[in-house]
């Protein structure tokens, strides 16, 4: 079995989504990661922040951070694919952690 690597995913949720829908969205994307072999260590809202420029017609959004470990890139690829087509996620970024 290959060694587990640490990753951090940051994504921005549109600001006009209600709390119940945002919770469902976060749960859905956490489940996508775990169903594809990743282990979610931490998944939490960072803050609602104003953008330097408009993204998708919005001037602000809620940043959500997920820390996880994965042995392969299946979970990351599926998260990337589905977040690109989801209208509630304005932007996302996946970073490999070195710590």
From Swiss-Prot:
One of its GO terms (cellular component) is ribosome. Keywords: Ribonucleoprotein, Ribosomal protein, RNA-binding, rRNA-binding. It holds the Pfam family Ribosomal_S6. One of its GO terms (biological process) is translation. The keyword Ribonucleoprotein applies. The keyword RNA-binding applies. InterPro entries: Ribosomal_bS6, Ribosomal_bS6_sf, Ribosomal_S6_plastid/chlpt, Transl_elong_EF1B/ribsomal_bS6. Coiled coil: none annotated. Gene3D superfamilies: 3.30.70.60. This is Small ribosomal subunit protein bS6. It comes from Lactiplantibacillus plantarum (strain ATCC BAA-793 / NCIMB 8826 / WCFS1) (Lactobacillus plantarum). The gene is rpsF.
């Amino acid at each position: 079995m290959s060694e587990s690597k640490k990753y951090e995913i940051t994504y921005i949720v549109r600001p006009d989504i209600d709390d119940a829908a945002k919770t469902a969205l976060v749960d859905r994307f956490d489940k996508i990661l775990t169903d594809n072999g990743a282990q979610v260590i931490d998944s939490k809202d960072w803050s609602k922040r104003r953008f330097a420029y408009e993204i998708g017609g919005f001037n602000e959004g809620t940043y959500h951070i997920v820390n996880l470990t994965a042995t392969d890139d299946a979970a990351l690829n599926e998260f990337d694919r589905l977040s690109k087509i989801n209208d509630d996620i304005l932007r996302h970024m996946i970073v490999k952690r070195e710590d």
